[in-house]
């Protein structure tokens, strides 16, 4: 039997891909968006800008939620691109694609629960890739100058 584990797959001069750092970059971007969104929601509820938890928000308040979540998506994608060991745009877009899949699942599960306007989860889904591109592009512009 041969020892395939000791055989290099691609030339001996290629650096390791650093899978752990790639995963961490994507997770860190998600965590940033999650924490920023939750903290903002809590503050807006505490200030009575948003109604108490359990009460349906007016549609116009979902516009504001969409705006700050879009900004947070850009920030999260920037963080992902910043931490990515290579190809920052790819990492940000992969993170956005995962977020879009999770957002789609969430939209399907909650569609008929009257939690808010139907356009809201759709807006979050379709802004994922543009947010990723903007966040990663900001990082790329920093590294190229």
Describe each region flagged by the PLM.
Residues 2-145:
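Juxtamembrane/disordered regions of integral membrane proteins
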